[in-house]
């Protein structure tokens, strides 16, 4: 028998964030935002349980964007001076943060989501992390100078966060590479 789960994120409620935008803005700040993220997460956990899914997730409700939600907790990323860059193999342009220094985690990236979700479900719990390929596709490199080498420091950060998610109650860690099909050549060059 196959275990059932969703793939990817779930839509954010209109009361949490703008809808139908690549990088939606939050509709609250401070403690009110934390509570809104928690409320949205709990609603989606309940919906997945009610649907009978075997494995539930946080729906990525606390992340503005699946890549940038990770990068917000990484030292060496400049969000203040975004630049325009072609992403998804130059399919479209986006304003992206820049890598400007060696990369280090500021602390746990998704501890809030892991603790909240684990406390509210007895089902198996899955967390999604972006893979290195989608990250390097969505940041401008102003430090490493080599797109082939740049994924490796990000991979080291995942080796820190993934076991921490597991220790925090995550049963499954999914590395998500949604635009792999537009980066086949990059994948073969980078391994």
What are these regions (language model features)?
Residues 1-191:
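Domain-level signal for soluble alpha/beta catalytic cores
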